[in-house]
Amino acid sequence: MKNLERPLHKAISFLEERGFRYAVIGGVALSQWGVVRATFDVDLKVLVPDTDYTALRLALRTAFRDRARPHVPENPLIVAVSIDDVVVDFLLAVPGYEELIIERAVRRELNGWSAWVCSAEDLIIQKVVAGRGKDWLDVEALLLEQGDQLDQAYIQDWLGQFAEALEQPELLTRYQDAVAKSNAG
């Protein structure tokens, strides 16, 4: 996290000085819940005031002019910039569940300053839905680290909704298997 701290602080300072609500997600958030793994970028979920995506994209691109990954086609929900040679992804929240991620974020201390960090439950939900191999390793590590502190009813309710909406019932069953495995170990 050492190399990420300065760009993370710059990004968060920008958001907080302008009153934008956000939550740190991804690998940096994992470290705040006791799971340490290599991460090379910063991911921030940002609430879009009055759903004015254009204004927020413009504000971010004006403040942080160095575009990250210029070879990748732009996604209207992601503003990817480079701050001090670190990729910072501002992921613009869509109404609904993603707003809850920000509402449920908790203030955590980060080496003398603080930031809003995604809850462990919402981090698990995002990782299960993403479904990559490394995401499942993160889910298993979070289950071991956070255990009984997790609100399983909340997690399983949202995973059930995503499983149905995405027509992927295995999301919920695979997660339930991971919970059973962590409880047995």
Could you say what each language-model-derived stretch is?
Residues M1-G185:
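Compositionally biased terminal segments of proteins
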